[in-house]
Amino acid sequence: MELTPRDKDKLMLFTAGLLAERRKAKGLKLNYPEAIALITCAIMEGAREGRTVAEMMALGREMLTRDDVMEGIAEMIQDVQVEATFPDGTKLVTVHNPIV
């Protein structure tokens, strides 16, 4: 099976997102890469399911709170940008201040 570099990146993000999801479910506080991966993975999957850009932006802001991440992580993540594939094409989704 041949994967393009973009497909490899998507697969790596998905794997990191699953790991972050499991750690969050265990009650562990997420670090920077885990928080980014969780938000990114959810946006990519939602886009693939046919949701709108606005829905994905809202989802990105609702996924994590300060209690879900390690100290200082919320301040480190000001924006998350994801290039996601929607039914009508690839679009850039930007989530400002995703951790409340």
From Swiss-Prot:
GO terms for molecular function: nickel cation binding; urease activity. GO terms for cellular component: cytoplasm. Its EC number is 3.5.1.5. It comes from the Bacteria. It is found in: Cytoplasm. SUPFAM superfamilies: Urease, gamma-subunit. Its main location: cytoplasm. Keywords: Cytoplasm, Hydrolase. It catalyses: urea + 2 H2O + H(+) = hydrogencarbonate + 2 NH4(+). Transmembrane segments: none annotated. GO terms for biological process: urea catabolic process. NCBIfam families: PRK13241.1 (NF009712), urease_gam (TIGR00193). Heterotrimer of UreA (gamma), UreB (beta) and UreC (alpha) subunits. Three heterotrimers associate to form the active enzyme. Belongs to the urease gamma subunit family. This is Urease subunit gamma. The lineage of its organism: Bacteria, Pseudomonadati, Pseudomonadota, Gammaproteobacteria, Alteromonadales.
